[in-house]
Amino acid sequence: MKIKLFTRKSDELYYRQQGIERFIDAQKTDYKIALAEIERGRKQSHWIWYIFPQFVGLGRSCYSTLYGIRDRQEAEEYLQNEVLGCRLREITNALLKHNDKTAEEIFGGLDAMKVRSCMTLFDSISPGDIFAQVLDTFYDGKRCEFTLSAIADKTV
């Protein structure tokens, strides 16, 4: 898998201006890899930012900035997008099949926190959807406090 490295600030700006298309572009080769890894019950490669996106500001890397969901509208667009919404639900369903493991066993500690943030964000956008099931199954129903604060502050 190739990871795009930003060589100039203009590169990052260009990708940010692409809207949710930036996720589709990133997933072109890596979605199948990510799904296969989750189906096997263990994340092994680097794709978390654009497969399970979270609210911008949670991470400090260029990838967490680039693939961070900027506001509620972008989160809604992501879920409503025919490709992205379908893929997020598909890989989330695959994750739920591993209810005999912890999120940390599947993702590792840091990425397990990112998934919790992602599920909290999308559960707030689409209550009653599959995302609450992940939070209940892997996180004892506990939501990401930072994400909830951002939503309450209307920054998402």
Feature locations, PLM:
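A long, hydrophobic alpha-helical segment
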Residues: 27-39
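Charged phosphate-binding loop/patch that engages nucleotide di/tri-phosphates or the phosphate backbone
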Residues: 127-156
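Residue-level detector of well-ordered alpha-helical segments, enriched
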Residues: 43-50, 87, 111-118, 130, ...
